[in-house]
Amino acid sequence: MYAATLPPDPDNAALLYYQAFLLRPDPDAETSASIDKVIRGGEPDEKLREYLNLSDCRETIEFAEAAAQLPYCNWGIRFSQGLGARLPQLEHFRPLRFLLYADARVLAMDGDYHAALNRCLTIRRIASHVGDDTMLNYVVSTDIDGSALRYIQNILGSMLPDAEILTWLRGQLASVQGAVLSPARVLEMDLELIMQSMRNDPNDLLWLREQLVEDNEGKSAEYFWNMTDEELLALITEPYADFLDYALGVIDSEMPYEEKYVELQRLTDKFKEEFSNIPGTNQLAIAFAPQIIEIYSLQVRYTAQFNALKSAIGIYLVTANTGRLPDTLPDYLPKDPFSGQDFEYEFTEDGFILRCRAKDIYWTSHTLWPPNTPPDVLARSIVYEYEYKIQSNTESN
């Protein structure tokens, strides 16, 4: 007797995401404007609903949802290409997340807030799958997750506080993995990709040997010419690897934000000064060492946004149970990572604001202001605040 046996569905989420990318229909100009309006806070219109009801749109969402539920995701990155490895999938996540959020906004408008928030959680899962295999993956992953947190913030502001949904959401945020917080793996992978790029270019290795022979005063020319390629790479990269170890130790320490930032800056300046004249290592010192502070700052900004959202859910829960905003922050809410203290809590006409108590040192010093910017603007510190809205049947002081 014949018994059909179908092979199982793919267990690699990337295969489903790639199909979602191919299925997603390109919106026309009018629909693109509708999507952009929703992303900027506007309401969904009929043109957007028509687009979302297309069969290819529904299947795109279904494939993305199925992919996001899988634990394993391998994008097929050709790591052997080093820093030249192509990442064509990354450009597709922006329109995909916009599509998912547009659908979430329609669901919220129709009163299905649970499903709307689930769409946003799918975007968080996608951020986790984008991963930290390369520096670009890490940055895109964090950006996607930050968008998901903003989208959740917007959905919460469109609904009446509901204790059941809020309790469920709080649990989901604790269990659903978003972007990888620790920069350790991506920084170590970055170094490995740098080394692989050098391996791939014999002319680059030849130039490095010639420069070391020419510039080194303590070793003979034969010492460098007799080195294997791997020994040469180790000589060039070991100082940077040691620097990474020290820097990651600082990031993982219990030091407060400002002390960590100052120490990372000191380590970076010291490394650049010590190795700026050593061929090969000087390229790492100039091009890659400064990104430690950039990545750490990105991590802290993301943590502030995530902690603010979790704190806001605590406030919404009190509001759902009492019918009014609490006078002060509930106990045991996450802290502002810039200051290590509770967020500042301020009432507004239609909700509340959570504000960090200390500035973002990196962006305060690196913001590029246009010419003729007033001095009082130039003197401002970058301090983040997060505004949350409450629907009108609640009250505040």
Give residue spans per PLM region.
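Short acidic linear motifs
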Residues: 1-397
